């Protein structure tokens, strides 16, 4: 069980009524708290929770409409996302309890200071390198529309400026990361057809593909609901059409793809997690058509080339700069 869940269950008597668990991990916490419901924005966690606790988990960027008497937020990595979620929960809990649980290395002590905007926070427990905080909502805020927190910026690309809309919690929020910047220089000569932007984030790569290859069908895929929402906003801001879907890794992707383009993720919260990226590389041949291509950027220290060669039988390094490599491989 997640150590944060274990800390929560040390105070289980506080959580016996209708409770919303925001950012709920995919463990047995719902099984221990029979009146609780989960809210998650991670498609993989949603699939696991729904399979074990059918009808008790909500997926998306908005809180579920069902009533709850108290709520607990599992602290996310992003400070901006934490602020949005705390505000959203507090807006529905006037005079009631809001809890915050998180790891010390994830910044729980600093994040707990945000609770002071709603009342007088107090620390209830500290164990398993985690802390549990509580506040009674004396001053319920107005709920903020998610789009009001969007960061909008413009990228100067070869074929003209691209408008990007990023949301709290999305990778490289409000800026272009160095890996994607390098990959944007290597989008020439791609095979047309059905293109996939895997781990799309704010949709920079997918939007660029659709503009450069307008006759191709472009699908953008991410595990995170906030990334899916941001990608849709980015496409709309540029007058582009594309399919944006949520799913847990490459298994959720279409088949017969002409291209897989990616700056694959390797973090889950504050933890390093290479599973999604390694699955992408190992299973790429299942999703590419014959002659289809995979082109991706990754940190130079990651040993991805042998995995790509094992899956597709070939791999070349197109470029290397600023600690990143561009890999290219074709399904024979």
UniProtKB/Swiss-Prot annotation:
Leading EC class: transferase
Keyword rRNA processing: yes
Keywords assigned by UniProt, alphabetized: Cytoplasm, Methyltransferase, rRNA processing, S-adenosyl-L-methionine, Transferase
Record carries keyword Nucleotide-binding: no
EC number from the UniProt entry: 2.1.1.172
Subcellular location, record wording: Cytoplasm
Catalysed conversion reaction: guanosine(1207) in 16S rRNA + S-adenosyl-L-methionine = N(2)-methylguanosine(1207) in 16S rRNA + S-adenosyl-L-homocysteine + H(+)
Predominant subcellular localization, coarse grouping: cytoplasm
GO MF, one example: 16S rRNA (guanine(1207)-N(2))-methyltransferase activity
GO CC annotations, alphabetized: cytoplasm
Protein role: Specifically methylates the guanine in position 1207 of 16S rRNA in the 30S particle.
Self-association and partners: Monomer.
Family: Belongs to the methyltransferase superfamily. RsmC family.
Full protein name: Ribosomal RNA small subunit methyltransferase C
Gene: rsmC
């Amino acid at each position: 069980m997640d150590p944060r869940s274990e800390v929560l269950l040390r105070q289980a008597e506080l959580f016996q009524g209708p409770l919303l668990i925001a950012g709920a991990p995919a463990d047995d916490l719902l099984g221990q708290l029979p009146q609780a419901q989960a809210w998650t924005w991670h498609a993989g966690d949603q699939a696991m929770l729904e399979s074990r606790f059918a009808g008790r988990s909500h997926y998306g960027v908005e809180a579920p409409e069902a009533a709850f008497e108290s709520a607990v937020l599992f602290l996310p990595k992003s400070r901006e996302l934490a602020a949005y979620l705390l505000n959203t929960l507090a807006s529905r809990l006037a005079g009631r309890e809001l809890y915050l649980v998180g790891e010390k290395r994830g910044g729980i002590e600093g994040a707990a200071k945000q609770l002071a905007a709603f009342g007088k926070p107090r620390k209830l427990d500290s164990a398993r390198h985690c802390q549990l905080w509580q506040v009674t909502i004396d001053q319920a805020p107005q709920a903020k529309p998610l789009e009001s927190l969007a960061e909008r910026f413009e990228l100067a690309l070869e074929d003209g400026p691209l408008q990007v809309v990023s949301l709290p919690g999305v990778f490289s929020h409000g800026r272009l990361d160095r890996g994607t910047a390098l990959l944007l220089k290597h989008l020439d000569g791609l095979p047309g057809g059905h293109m996939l932007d895997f781990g799309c984030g704010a949709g920079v790569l997918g939007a660029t593909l659709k503009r450069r290859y307008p006759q191709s069908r472009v699908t953008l895929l991410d595990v995170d609901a906030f990334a899916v929402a941001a990608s849709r906003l980015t496409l709309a801001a540029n007058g582009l059409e594309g399919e944006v879907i949520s799913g847990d890794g490459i298994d959720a992707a279409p088949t017969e793809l002409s291209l897989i383009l990616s700056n694959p993720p390797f973090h889950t919260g504050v933890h390093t997690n290479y599973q999604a990226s390694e699955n992408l590389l190992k299973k790429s041949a299942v999703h590419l058509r014959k002659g289809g291509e995979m082109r991706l950027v990754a940190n130079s220290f990651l040993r991805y080339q042998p995995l790509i060669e094992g899956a597709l039988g070939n791999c070349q390094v197109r470029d290397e700069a600023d600690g990143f490599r561009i890999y290219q491989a074709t399904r024979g």
